[in-house]
Amino acid sequence: MEALVYTFLLVSTLGIIFFAIFFREPPKIQTKKTK
């Protein structure tokens, strides 16, 4: 059970970092399009 919690925490942290990097570049193009 503990292993599952640790794995979930690791995956969630990795997902947040991945999303942060992935959504860090597109906004530049989106802000340019909206303006």
UniProtKB/Swiss-Prot annotation:
BP-aspect Gene Ontology terms: photosynthesis
Transmembrane stretches, start-end: 3-23
UniProt entry tagged with the keyword NADP: no
One Pfam family it belongs to: PsbT
Protein location: Plastid, Chloroplast thylakoid membrane
Primary subcellular site in the record, as a coarse category: plastid
Entry's Gene Ontology cellular component terms: chloroplast thylakoid membrane; photosystem II reaction center
Keyword Nucleotide-binding: no
Membrane topology: Single-pass membrane protein
UniProt xrefs under HAMAP family: PSII_PsbT
PANTHER family, A to Z: PHOTOSYSTEM II REACTION CENTER PROTEIN T, PTHR36411
Record family assignment: Belongs to the PsbT family.
Protein name per UniProt: Photosystem II reaction center protein T
Source species: Oenothera argillicola
GN (gene name): psbT
